[in-house]
């Protein structure tokens, strides 16, 4: 925690600490960060880097004749178009690739929404990734694992059977959630950071701010179009990954500068689960947070 000495004074997020965090010059972020930080010029460059990273881990493991096991998000998403081009053009064999997706929306009863639903992650990935990959690359449906509300241990057991995750890719949500591991919110019940880090695949109710932000990003501001629940991979599976790569592509999403800076420069807190990545094994080397320059620039709070 010595990295934060003189910067952050509160364990929970406070106004005074946020003023400091938001004003740190871009070139000093790495000085105060316990995780690796990479700043790129544009979101297009970010998507290309993310797709290339995904492709390279598959290629490298193919050369070693070992399977590749990665956790993938459905957000950000533009990197998948680039990944399809790389895989098809370079004829990357996918027969030993295992894909574990982070989450999926549920209806109010806790059942999976249909793939035809406009908010379905399964439907989106089928259309924008799986159906576009050349069939001779060898990726089968059995290699694609989604969290299942009817069998919550399925993905956990499969990850364990395969020997763990090589890389977890993801974004960071409005209040710092990774996948749908949102800040725990209960009037009566309390959990510790240790409890949260040991959380496994589970069903959650969306927080109110997630409704708002996701409706703006994906439903034209229609909060009623956002399914109320979700099934998410647990923090345990994420934190047990050998490497974690998070990407903040929020140049046009005005909430992402704060999310990015908190994840990198605020001490671990349940208020913002993204900060818990700092508790990964040797996080300066094993956790990398990438942002485009517009997202990473300091924000002083003045109206734009």
Which stretches of residues belong to each language-model region?
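Gly/Ser/Thr-rich loops at beta-strand to alpha-helix junctions
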Residues: 70-79, 174-177, 251-253
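ATP/pyrophosphate-binding catalytic subdomain of soluble kinases
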Residues: 52, 147-192
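A glycine- and small-aliphatic-rich helix-loop capping segment at beta-alpha/alpha-beta transitions
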Residues: 83-94, 116-117, 183-192
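Glycine-rich N-terminal segment of FAD-binding domains in flavoprotein oxidoreductases
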Residues: 59-91
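Glycine-rich phosphate/diphosphate-binding loops that line cofactor/substrate pockets in enzymes
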Residues: 51-66, 238-239
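Class I SAM-dependent methyltransferase SAM-binding "motif I" and its flanking Rossmann-like core
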Residues: 179-227
